[in-house]
Amino acid sequence: MAFTGKYQLESHENFEAFMKAVGVPDDEVEKGKDIKSISEIHQDGKDFKVTVTAGTKVILYSFTVGEECELETFTGDRAKTVVQMDGNKLTAFVKGIESVTELDGDTISNTLSFNGIVYKRISRRIS
C-alpha cells in the first residue's frame, strides 16, 4: 500500500508538552496547538516528496528510503537522518527524536518520542 495521498490532522495527543520539550517557543506552541495541518505525500517506490501545510507555514522535504537526507525539525533547524521503511512503517531519528509513521488504510499515525515524552498524531486521507 502506497503512502501517496493528502491527509488532514484529525487528532493529536501531548502536543504542548512535546513541543516545549524539543525547544519550540511558547508562543509558537500556543499558535500551533489548534491547527489542523494538511500533509501531501507522493511516493514513488523508495522516493518520497512531502508537503506539510500548517496554517501559513509550508514545509517541503524529500527523501529516499535508506539514504541520508536533511529534514526540518520542529524548531526550524535542518538535521541529517536516514529514513527506514518496513512494510507500511517509516522510522527516522532526528536530533534525539524518534519518529514512527505508520499507514493503516486511510489513516496515518505518527508517534514521536523525545526524552520519554510521546506525541501522537492521527491523520486521515482526504484525497
Curated annotation (Swiss-Prot):
Found, by tissue, as follows: In adults, weakly expressed in the intestine.
| Origin superkingdom | Eukaryota
Signal sequence range = none
Q: Output the GO biological process annotations, alphabetical, semicolon-separated.
A: fatty acid transport
Location within or outside the cell: Cytoplasm
Pfam family name, one: Lipocalin_7
Q: Does the keyword Cytoplasm apply?
A: yes
Keywords, A to Z?
A: Cytoplasm, Lipid-binding, Transport
Output the Gene Ontology terms for molecular function. Answer: fatty acid binding
InterPro entries (UniProt xref): Calycin, Fatty_acid-bd, ILBP
Q: Name one GO cellular component term.
A: nucleus
- Major subcellular site: cytoplasm
Q: Function, please? A: Binds free fatty acids and their coenzyme A derivatives, bilirubin, and some other small molecules in the cytoplasm. May be involved in intracellular lipid transport.
Show the domain comment: Forms a beta-barrel structure that accommodates hydrophobic ligands in its interior.
UniProt similarity note? Belongs to the calycin superfamily. Fatty-acid binding protein (FABP) family.
What protein is this chain from? Fatty acid binding protein 1-A, liver
**Natural source organism:** Danio rerio
